[in-house]
């Protein structure tokens, strides 16, 4: 059937007699059952379903909004109704749907802007890199014939500088991360083959905007190193500068040596600079920490991602070539590798002995320089000279990462050692079959062609053999490590090709890193799963390896930085390859960290890297701790390298350690300890003492010790880091090296020394972090060891330190001694355990410190707020927090990596989150252990750490946007964390298996609590550090909306704890709202091209002219949004930009812009905008409330007081804040204005200088209710506002987030009033003082209450006997039932127990000052409260008569969350004859009978109140209501209520109105909260804290609806939804149960009694008293309606059949004489409510009061009751949320006499709860009926009614006629 079109007339004025009709077009779809109405402009107005399939001219149709008259059929192809332009518009409009849908379909949803994820589009000095590496690039292409290289190269060449990730995406099918690495590698290749590793890193960095720079160093090792040194600082300053610097900075040997010397001398500075470069190489490693943490880190992350992608790509294409290198490097058989090892061994030893990073670097730089000079840099395979050979060897050796690691270690000394041991550990980890396989794969991926070959080779090979081989290689490389370092320098200079080979080899070696990943093998597979399967896994592993390598490089860089930039640069790539084993181990860690370790291994890498960054200090630490396990670990690690191949298979851990360590004798122990975290944990657990010995040994030998210490520390870190790696990686994300190292180090320490004191110390430094990671890895032994250790050591100090020491500077500033102590200065300041103990865990401390350093930006604040918590649960909490941190960090890092890689943030987030979830699974088990002692405190601490770390990660990940990124990271982390938690819960069995030590219950508890703890800590961190956070960047586009994770405990440890937790929970909620808006914003921006705006040069402006079509005047059309209600509301269309008089009829939907009109460089489906207004209109159409091009105005406050009262100038000095306001006020002049209802006081605004809200953004709230007459809104900054950054009259863009007045008010209330001095009730809100008061601790607290505070307490002179006597009198007078009497007696006892603060200390002398009353529905709660208030008033009058001194008068405050609830109690007082109260609130919201006793709360202006009251008089009121309003006007004119407010003893006010100024000076010792189960605890605290409450009465029903928190969902039941009522019950309060219900017919109450109250209900009403309203109407009935549910907007449902039957039921009831006010309709969905309301308003029932029928949702009906209740269930397919017990309880208990349920019998009967409801109905007579059977009876009733109505009308007419005739 063809689509038919009809010319119609339509009107929206359905009910008016004289209607205004408009022209339109009605299109009938091809199915014939649906029609779409368009106006004459072609705008789609509404769609309607047709009852008759045939539409003819003359038909009258009715839709939901319009009446439609069909005039004539429209001829096909004819113009529209109007002759000219408008017809065109109509026609185009008619085509709009099809074309727009077509275009939308083509539109790639994930399309990203060019500057995706970048703060600004950085122009990469790619050309320079290409120029330098032109030869190498060519050679690379040749050497790496694999298609990926060449293909990627061109792709990258075109988009490399800005979008390496994007290019990678296209090039590689690997996961986002993988793709990113691939892209990077391609770039490197294109830029320079050898520079691939560095370039690789660089590219990642470049992804941030430093990619070119990285490439440069990579391309020419020598040049790069020089440029690195010189340009590293530049890089810190700017990525761009670095890139050019690289190309230009070719230093001579002497220069490089000088630089190296200076670097070694100023290691910190070098690290700062070089790390920037290295971070590119090792995004996870030191780079971030040392240099700009954010930029470098971001770069490194990007690099890591690119690398990973590259690796995956390279393995396939470069396998053969790389295999050549890899076999030599990786396999001990390789002669090259062996030679290198042999040669490197002495060098390595030399380096180790020297442990002079400068010398090492010098050597390496010399080699590198030589190679560069000789132009051998470009030769991959053949070394030109010895130096070149070394380089080549290094390349070959690169597979044996140990070598490179050793070199690195020697270079970085401590740092390198850490790297080595870490890499070794990882390597050994890789040795395990699972890991090894993946490791090899990874290597293959990294190694490009060779890697690809290796990947297949390794895959076939059994993991153990591979591991052994790797270990062997590692040993060799370790032995040659020092030489390798030099070689690396040489190689770097040798040739880019060599470097590329090295890179590939490095990548291959990185699989060693993958070993670490393998440690997390299970996780690895999970992580890999996220990206791909085995090959994918291998690629991922490779990526991870690469990332690990990057990390390694950054670590190396740290140390190397001191030695020399050039060498480091060359070394980094080479290190990646040459130090392949150690590095690989590290890279594996890094790789794992980035991919798998993103969740796991990464953390591990980070730890060592962090240590490396603090190379000198760490080195010093290592030396001082020569005797400690670190050195020994290093020593035996090296030895193990030689001997541990067999051991490798036996103990992968040992192998890894061997690679990293020097002493053979201790290698077995060391291996276990340093190597494989999971295995190592096991091994370490058993040989814990040995481990400690090893550590001590390591400390004993200084030369090797330094490197060993570094290695061992990393090893230790690894051991714990392996599990920690996941965290570390995440941490890595935040603070590439430093942070990660710390966290991991601590964990490693635990791993290595589970049973040893060193282990303990490590744990202490590690805090709980270490244990958590091992658990994550699933090392049962380690976990076991760790869990006890974690519990034992004071982990909190480490976490505290980490928070304090988040700063890079802190890490750099670490002194050798501090490193020795294994604590950063910050840590020391915080005060870790004994410095000696710390020394035992220098790396752990270091790791923990760097970790802290990363979070330092956000973490320190968090730390401080949560410090008390950390102290309480120091060890356990720390562990938990570390785990959580890792978890969260990992998530963040993953996100960051993806973003950096250039892949869409969302895409990367999703896979990573899944992987992370797995890691979370592991993390949770460790948390169990650590959580055991103090879960609460630990949870808080965990959360804090996690949040801090994750925040840093996020910032790094998000490309140096630390301030916003941390928030977004935290938000994403929250999401990922939730996902992880989900995974954890799903895979609990697996995690439990991993954590054998943890009991199942403990594990589960930890999982839940740790998650919540993490979230809480995160939130605390956000609150303390950044408060509100608006995420920037597009990484969040595809992320899931976070859920609230903050866990609110039943008991609090202190007021500070209470404030922190609730502040965190509220901030978390607001941040989720901000996240959701940011997600909408970036999703909308990702679908369009705004390159004209984001481009610095505006090159696309030329094409912008073509973006918008031309109107009939040949002028660019303007973009306008549809504002009228209807289906097209919010759609954008082009129209003429002329004035109305000259406007042509041009019209075109935005989606209809033809592809030819779009710029060539954009996809056809992308809409292009060339002006900001169009972007703003588009964003608003996407439900983003943006105000573009507003003005930010700053004005000084005027001193009105001084001007008006010149003689009182002295007063200005008395209170200058009040009399002379010097602060500037901020005003936002809006560019447009909505209706006044859109704005309110407390609106949340986000202000930015850029329309993409990426840079220079702050959050503020509105100070008043709306814009002024000149569209100005006064703003109060909340977060991110710095006056120097925001000059006046600047153009800004604004987002109106939501109204947050409640949240902001509660936050302010908690901060201002919740303190012991102002809240006497506080101790009882924190914990059960009844039992706690017995402790001396509690008593001592009370002693600190100042006398001035206790003296103002109210005092009663009444004895308990007199109070109880008064209560009994009232019980008799008001006939209270037994339960009500019990409640009143308990209140009387509470009031008699005076001196609540002192006397309550007597445990059994008096009752608690809190009474909790649980009243079921209809239990007379409001009546009971009225009687209680009468009792209190009489009591007050008696006791106040004898008060003396400054005792406060007794007053009672009646409060609730709703006006109805407050008025209900006051109406009860009126019914009892009590009128001495004042109701404070809004005039329009107060019940009319209470109005005469009201006081307007909003303003002190009497005239405004009178205006409101006079306006009420003009409305439709009943006579009695008019009396109330007139009386109220009189009271207001006289001002009596304002005076009475300070005199009366009873005041009623809602919680929200408690902050109004008229209540400022009042104190209410007694507070009554009604409907408390519907109020959040922060809202409940408004009346409690503000008015210095001493006695509290809570009334509610927790079995009814909980508070609704709009905008965010909770991940558990202990968040903001947990009310004060719930928490007090959990705390131990026993509520008084009011069991007697007086509302419902016994048949109705029987349902609730059976389903929800376990048979405890008592009926206070008989069936006779609830007789039917109509004889034919059943008391309880289920009407089965056969209808179909339909999904409406906002995922709400409609059932038209049920709505129609409900309407007929209402009509029948009213026709039978039932008053409309007796009928209530409850629907479970809003859309159904609107549908029924529309039907009621549209149908003329002939009853004037039809509108009085109350139709509302369950939420709005709570507290109300009706004689007849009709319940519409709506759903027909699935029950959905309507089976919520609390929701059902409310819905079923609103009717007093009749409950009529309308629903689908077949659907609801399947549900457990609804099935039982139906059973109850079936048990009644006529309890189950079918609508089809009932309708005839109802129709008959209606017919009779209508006939009677007609007769009456006829009679009236006849009477009138007869009267007329008589006249």
Swiss-Prot record:
Biased composition (Polar residues): 173-185, 300-321
GO CC annotations on file: nucleus
EC number from the UniProt entry: 5.6.2.3
Positions with a binding annotation for Zn(2+): 1111, 1113, 1136, 1144
Root EC class: isomerase
Domain of life, source organism: Eukaryota
Compositionally biased spans, kind Basic and acidic residues: 81-90, 533-545
Assembly: Interacts with DNA repair protein RAD51; the interaction promotes RAD51 strand exchange activity. Also interacts with DNA repair proteins EXO1 and BRCA1; the interactions are increased following DNA damage induction.
Compartment annotation: Nucleus
Gene for this chain: Zgrf1
Described function: 5'-3' DNA helicase which is recruited to sites of DNA damage and promotes repair of replication-blocking DNA lesions through stimulation of homologous recombination (HR). Promotes HR by directly stimulating RAD51-mediated strand exchange activity. Not required to load RAD51 at sites of DNA damage but promotes recombinational repair after RAD51 recruitment. Also promotes HR by positively regulating EXO1-mediated DNA end resection of DNA double-strand breaks. Required for recruitment of replication protein RPA2 to DNA damage sites.
Alphabetic keyword roster: ATP-binding, DNA damage, DNA repair, Helicase, Hydrolase, Isomerase, Metal-binding, Nucleotide-binding, Nucleus, Phosphoprotein, Zinc, Zinc-finger
Organism: Mus musculus (Mouse)
Pfam families: AAA_11 (PF13086), AAA_12 (PF13087), ZGRF1-like_N (PF10382), Zn_ribbon_GRF (PF06839)
Listed Low complexity bias regions: 92-105
Catalytic activity: ATP + H2O = ADP + phosphate + H(+); Couples ATP hydrolysis with the unwinding of duplex DNA at the replication fork by translocating in the 5'-3' direction. This creates two antiparallel DNA single strands (ssDNA). The leading ssDNA polymer is the template for DNA polymerase III holoenzyme which synthesizes a continuous strand
Gene Ontology molecular-function annotations: 5'-3' DNA helicase activity; ATP binding; hydrolase activity; zinc ion binding
Any GO BP annotation: recombinational repair
Keyword Hydrolase applies: yes
Disordered as annotated region, ranges: 78-110, 132-196, 300-349, 460-496, 524-545, 610-664
Modified residues (Phosphoserine): 331, 445
Name this protein carries in UniProt: 5'-3' DNA helicase ZGRF1
GRF-type zinc finger segments: 1111-1153
Bilayer-spanning residue ranges: none
């Amino acid at each position: 059937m063809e689509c038919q079109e009809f010319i119609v007339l339509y009107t929206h004025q359905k009910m008016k007699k004289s209607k205004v009709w408009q022209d339109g077009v009605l299109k009938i779809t091809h199915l014939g059952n649906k029609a779409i109405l368009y106006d004459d402009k072609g705008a789609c107005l509404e769609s309607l379903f047709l009852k008759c399939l045939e539409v003819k001219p003359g038909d009258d149709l009715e839709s939901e909004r319009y009446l439609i008259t069909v005039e004539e059929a429209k001829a096909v192809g004819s113009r529209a109704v109007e002759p000219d332009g408008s017809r065109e518009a109509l026609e185009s409009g008619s085509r709009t749907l099809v074309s727009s849908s077509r275009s939308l379909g083509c539109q790639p949803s994930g399309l990203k802007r060019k500057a995706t994820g970048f703060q600004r589009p950085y122009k990469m000095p790619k050309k320079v890199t290409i120029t330098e590496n032109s030869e190498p690039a060519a050679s690379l292409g040749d050497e790496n014939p694999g298609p990926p290289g060449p293909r990627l190269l061109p792709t990258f060449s075109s988009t490399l500088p800005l979008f390496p990730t994007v290019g990678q995406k296209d090039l590689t099918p690997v996961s986002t991360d993988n793709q990113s690495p691939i892209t990077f590698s391609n770039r490197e290749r294109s830029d320079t083959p050898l520079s691939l590793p560095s370039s690789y890193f660089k590219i990642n960095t470049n992804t941030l905007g430093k990619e070119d720079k990285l490439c440069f160093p990579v391309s020419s090792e020598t040049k790069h190193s020089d440029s690195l040194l010189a340009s590293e600082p530049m890089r810190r300053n700017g990525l761009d500068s670095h890139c050019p610097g690289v190309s230009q900075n070719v230093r001579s040997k002497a220069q490089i040596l000088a630089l190296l010397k200076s670097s070694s001398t100023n290691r910190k500075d070098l690290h700062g600079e070089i790390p920037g470069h290295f971070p590119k190489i090792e995004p996870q490693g030191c780079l971030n920490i040392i240099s700009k943490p954010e930029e470098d880190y971001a770069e490194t992350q990007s690099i890591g991602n690119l690398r990973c992608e590259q690796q995956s790509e390279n393995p396939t294409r470069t396998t053969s070539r790389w295999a050549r290198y890899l076999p030599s490097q990786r396999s001990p058989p390789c002669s090259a590798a062996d030679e290198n090892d042999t040669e490197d061994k002495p060098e390595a030893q030399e380096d180790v002995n020297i442990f002079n990073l400068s010398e090492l670097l010098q050597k390496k730089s010399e080699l590198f320089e030589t190679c560069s000079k000789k132009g051998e840099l470009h030769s991959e395979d053949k070394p030109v000279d010895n130096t070149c050979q070394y380089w080549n060897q290094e390349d070959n050796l690169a597979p044996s990462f140990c070598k490179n690691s050793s070199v690195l270690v020697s270079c970085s000394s401590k740092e390198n050692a850490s790297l080595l041991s870490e890499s070794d550990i990882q390597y050994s980890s890789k040795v395990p079959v699972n890991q090894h396989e993946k490791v090899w794969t990874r290597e293959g991926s990294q190694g490009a062609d060779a890697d690809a070959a290796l990947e297949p080779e390794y895959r076939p090979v059994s993991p153990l053999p591979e591991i052994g081989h790797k270990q062997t290689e590692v040993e060799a490389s370790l032995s040659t490590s020092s030489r390798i370092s030099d070689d690396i320098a040489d190689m770097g200079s040798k040739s880019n090709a060599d470097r590329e080979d090295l890179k590939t080899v490095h990548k291959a070696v990185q699989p060693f890193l993958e070993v670490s990943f393998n440690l997390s093998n299970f996780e690895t597979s999970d992580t890999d799963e996220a990206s791909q399967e085995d090959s994918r896994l291998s690629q991922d592993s490779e990526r991870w390896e690469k990332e690990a390598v990057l990390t390694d490089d950054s670590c190396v860089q740290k140390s190397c930085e001191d030695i020399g930039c050039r060498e480091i640069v060359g070394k980094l790539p080479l290190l990646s390859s040459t130090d392949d084993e150690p590095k690989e181990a590290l890279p594996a860690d890094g790789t794992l960290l980035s991919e798998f370790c993103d969740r796991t291994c990464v953390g591990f890498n980070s730890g060592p890297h962090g240590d490396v960054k603090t190379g000198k200090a760490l080195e010093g630490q290592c030396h001082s701790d020569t005797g400690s396990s670190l050195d020994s670990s290093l020593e035996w690690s090296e030895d193990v390298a030689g001997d541990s191949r067999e051991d490798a298979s036996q103990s992968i851990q040992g192998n890894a350690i061997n690679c990293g360590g020097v002493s053979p004798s201790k290698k077995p122990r060391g291996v276990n300890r340093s190597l494989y975290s999971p295995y190592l944990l096991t091994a370490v657990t058993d040989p814990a003492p040995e481990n400690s010995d090893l550590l001590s040994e390591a400390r004993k030998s200084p030369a090797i010790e330094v490197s060993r210490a570094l290695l061992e520390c990393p090893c230790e870190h690894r051991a714990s880091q392996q599990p920690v790696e996941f965290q570390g990686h995440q941490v890595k994300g935040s603070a590439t090296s430093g942070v990660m190292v710390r966290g991991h180090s601590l964990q490693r320490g635990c791993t290595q020394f589970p049973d040893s004191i060193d282990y303990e110390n490590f744990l202490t430094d590690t805090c709980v972090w270490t244990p958590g990671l091992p658990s994550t890895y699933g090392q049962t032994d380690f976990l076991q060891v760790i869990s006890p250790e974690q519990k034992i050591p004071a982990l909190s100090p480490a976490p505290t330190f980490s928070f304090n020491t988040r700063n890079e500077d802190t890490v750099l500033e670490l002194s050798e001694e501090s490193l020795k102590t294994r604590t950063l200065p910050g840590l020391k300041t915080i005060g870790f355990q004994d410095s000696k103990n710390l020394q035992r865990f220098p790396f752990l401390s270091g790791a923990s410190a760097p970790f802290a350093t990363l979070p330092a930006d956000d973490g320190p604040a968090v730390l401080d707020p949560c410090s008390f918590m950390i102290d309480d649960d120091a060890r356990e909490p720390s562990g938990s927090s570390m785990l959580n941190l890792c978890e969260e960090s990992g998530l963040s890092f993953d996100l960051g990596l993806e973003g950096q890689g250039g892949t869409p943030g969302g895409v990367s987030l999703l896979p990573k989150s899944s992987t992370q979830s797995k890691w979370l699974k592991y993390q949770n088990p460790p948390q169990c252990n650590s959580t055991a002692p103090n879960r609460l405190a630990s949870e808080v601490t965990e959360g804090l750490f996690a949040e801090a770390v994750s925040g840093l990660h996020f910032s790094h990940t998000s490309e140096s946007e630390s301030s916003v990124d941390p928030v977004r990271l935290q938000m994403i982390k929250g999401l990922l964390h939730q996902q992880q938690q989900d995974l954890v819960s799903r895979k609990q069995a697996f995690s439990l298996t991993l954590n054998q030590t943890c009991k199942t219950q403990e594990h589960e508890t930890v999982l839940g609590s740790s998650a919540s703890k993490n979230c809480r800590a995160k939130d605390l961190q956000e609150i303390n550090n950044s408060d509100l956070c608006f995420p920037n960047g597009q990484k969040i586009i595809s992320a899931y909306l976070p859920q609230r994770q903050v866990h609110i405990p039943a008991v609090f440890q202190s007021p500070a704890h209470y404030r922190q937790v609730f502040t965190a929970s509220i901030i978390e909620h607001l941040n989720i709202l901000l996240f959701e808006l940011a997600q909408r914003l970036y999703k909308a921006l990702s679908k369009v091209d705004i390159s004209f705006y984001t481009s610095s040069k505006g090159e696309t402006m030329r094409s912008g002219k073509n973006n918008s079509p031309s109107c009939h005047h040949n002028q660019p059309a303007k973009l306008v949004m549809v504002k009228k209600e209807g289906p097209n509301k919010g759609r954008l269309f082009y129209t003429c930009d002329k004035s109305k008089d000259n406007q042509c009829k041009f019209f075109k939907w935005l989606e209809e812009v033809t592809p030819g009109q779009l710029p060539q460089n954009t996809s056809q489906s992308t809409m292009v905008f060339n002006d900001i207004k169009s972007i703003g209109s588009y964003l608003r159409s996407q439900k983003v409330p943006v105000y573009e091009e507003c003005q930010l105005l700053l004005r000084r406050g005027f001193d009105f007081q001084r001007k008006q009262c010149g003689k009182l100038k002295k007063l200005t000095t008395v209170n200058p804040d009040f009399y002379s306001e010097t602060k500037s006020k901020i005003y936002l002049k809006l560019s447009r204005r909505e209706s006044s209802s859109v704005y309110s006081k407390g609106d949340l605004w986000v202000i930015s200088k850029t329309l993409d809200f990426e840079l220079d953004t702050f959050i503020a709230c509105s100070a008043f209710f709306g814009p002024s007459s000149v569209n100005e809104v006064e703003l109060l900054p909340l977060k991110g506002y710095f006056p120097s950054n925001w000059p006046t009259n600047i153009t800004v863009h604004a987002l109106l987030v939501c109204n947050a007045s409640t949240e902001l008010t509660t936050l302010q209330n908690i901060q201002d009033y919740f303190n012991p001095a102002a809240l006497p009730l506080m101790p009882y809100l924190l914990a059960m003082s009844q039992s706690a008061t017995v402790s001396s601790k509690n008593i001592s607290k009370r002693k600190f209450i100042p006398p001035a505070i206790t003296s103002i307490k109210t005092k009663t002179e009444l004895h308990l006997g007199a109070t109880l006597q008064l209560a009994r009198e009232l019980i008799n007078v008001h006939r209270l039932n037994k339960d009500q009497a019990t409640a009143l007696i308990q209140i009387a006892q509470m009031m008699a127990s005076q001196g609540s603060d002192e006397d309550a200390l007597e445990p059994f002398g008096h009752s608690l000052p809190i009474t909790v009353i649980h009243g079921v529905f209809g239990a007379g709660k409001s009546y009971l409260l009225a009687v209680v208030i009468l009792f209190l008033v009489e009591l007050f009058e008696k006791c106040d008569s004898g008060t003396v001194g400054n005792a406060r008068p007794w007053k009672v405050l009646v409060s609730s969350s709703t006006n109805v609830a407050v008025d209900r109690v006051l109406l009860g007082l009126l019914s009892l004859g009590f009128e001495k109260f004042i109701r404070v609130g809004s005039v329009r919201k107060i019940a009319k009978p209470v109005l005469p006793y009201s006081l307007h709360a909003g303003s002190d202006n009497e005239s405004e109140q009178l205006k409101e009251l006079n306006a009420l008089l003009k409305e439709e009121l009943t006579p009695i209501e008019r009396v109330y309003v007139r009386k109220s006007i009189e009271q207001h004119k006289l001002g009596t209520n304002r005076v009475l407010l300070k005199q009366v003893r009873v005041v009623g006010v809602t919680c929200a109105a408690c902050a109004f100024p008229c209540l400022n000076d009042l104190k209410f010792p007694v507070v009554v909260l009604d409907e408390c189960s519907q109020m959040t605890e922060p809202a409940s605290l408004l009346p409690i804290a503000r008015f210095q409450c001493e006695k509290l009465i809570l009334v509610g029903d927790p079995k009814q609806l909980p508070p609704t928190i709009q905008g965010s969902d909770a991940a558990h039941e202990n968040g903001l939804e947990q009310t004060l009522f719930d928490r007090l019950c959990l705390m131990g309060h026993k509520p008084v149960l009011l069991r007697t219900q007086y509302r419902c017919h016994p048949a109705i109450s029987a349902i609730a009694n059976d389903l929800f109250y376990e048979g405890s209900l008592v009926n206070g009403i008989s069936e006779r008293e609830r007789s039917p309203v109509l004889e034919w109407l059943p008391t309880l009935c289920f009407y089965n309606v056969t209808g179909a549910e339909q999904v409406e907007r906002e995922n709400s449902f409609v059932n038209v059949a049920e709505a129609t039957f409900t309407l007929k039921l209402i009509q029948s009831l009213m026709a039978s004489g039932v008053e409309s006010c007796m009928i209530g309709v409850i629907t479970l969905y809003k859309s159904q409510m609107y549908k029924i309301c529309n039907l009621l308003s549209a149908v003329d029932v002939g009853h004037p009061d039809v509108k009085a029928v109350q139709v509302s949702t369950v939420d709005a009906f709570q507290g109300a009751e009706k004689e007849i209740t009709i319940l519409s269930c709506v759903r027909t397919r699935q029950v959905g949320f309507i089976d919520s017990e609390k929701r059902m309880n409310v819905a079923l208990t609103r009717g007093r006499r009749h409950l009529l349920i309308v629903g689908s019998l077949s659907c609801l009967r399947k549900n457990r709860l609804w099935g039982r409801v139906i059973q109850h109905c079936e048990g009644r007579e006529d309890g189950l009926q079918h609508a089809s059977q009932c309708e005839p009876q109802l129709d008959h009733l209606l017919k009779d009614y209508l006939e009677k109505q007609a007769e009456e009308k006829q009679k009236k007419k006849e009477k009138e006629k007869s009267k007329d005739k008589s006249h």
